[in-house]
């Protein structure tokens, strides 16, 4: 560790992983280790596209040279998989979890990630606000909150945890919660039950300008969120 009381960790998105060369990576690693000191990185395997295996292998080899721990990451956003997906209401391209091709894609992502890493984190896009015809049909008479809480528990078990641990029984899976706690239930985040099925939990700790950015996050929010989740899963 470079610091006494905390680790420094960074997250590398799939598109960047696919395009950076080994020479560029070593140049950036030299700079970061000189001026910051990185203990660990999360290598994203999917965000709209898969990170290529040869790129992941290159990253892991280079990071080993620098003594940097490496884990995987997944961001659950995807482009339209067919023409019918254009009708779906998918904020930030998040998945529709009632759509079979998208469910199959998520299962494939989980299996691929578990085959590459013994630990991975699910970034804080693991939610749904889709109200397409498929979602309305499956929701039935339940409220959107009831439906989404149940749906995301099912997705967690059957499309992420189950498939990943079948490929790699020792894989450690972390769910990262976003910083907008007031909307958890409406979007399917379930901190009451998900910590029982995931191996670890984490939460976003970023802050932004209080008046000029889209989420209006106050400076003290990171502290309150960490305290909240310490109580959820002590």
Predicted regions and their residues:
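Active-site-adjacent "subsite" loops/lids of carbohydrate-active enzymes
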Residues: 5-25, 56-116, 130-131, 158
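Short, flexible/disordered intra-domain loops and linkers
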Residues: 17-20, 89-92, 134-143, 185, ...
């Amino acid at each position: 560790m470079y610091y006494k009381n905390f680790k420094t960790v960074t997250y590398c998105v799939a598109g960047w992983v696919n395009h950076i060369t080994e020479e560029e990576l070593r140049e950036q690693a030299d700079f970061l280790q000189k001026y910051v000191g990185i203990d660990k990185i999360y290598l994203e395997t999917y965000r709209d596209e898969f990170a290529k295996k040869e790129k992941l292998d290159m990253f892991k080899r280079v990071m080993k040279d620098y003594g940097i721990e490496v884990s995987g990451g997944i961001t659950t956003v995807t482009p339209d998989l067919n023409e019918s997906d254009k009708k779906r209401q998918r904020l930030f391209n998040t998945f529709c979890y009632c759509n079979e091709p998208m469910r199959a894609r998520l299962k494939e992502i989980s299996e691929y990630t578990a085959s590459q890493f013994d630990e991975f984190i699910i970034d804080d896009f693991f939610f749904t606000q889709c109200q397409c015809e498929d979602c309305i049909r499956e929701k039935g008479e339940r409220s959107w909150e009831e439906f989404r809480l149940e749906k995301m528990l099912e997705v967690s078990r059957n499309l992420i945890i189950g498939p990943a641990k079948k490929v790699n029984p020792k894989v450690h899976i972390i769910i990262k919660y976003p910083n907008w706690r007031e909307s958890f239930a409406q979007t399917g985040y379930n901190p009451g039950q998900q910590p029982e099925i995931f191996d670890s939990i984490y939460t976003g700790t970023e802050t932004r300008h209080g008046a000029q950015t889209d989420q209006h996050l106050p400076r003290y929010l990171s502290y309150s969120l960490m305290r909240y989740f310490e109580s959820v899963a002590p």
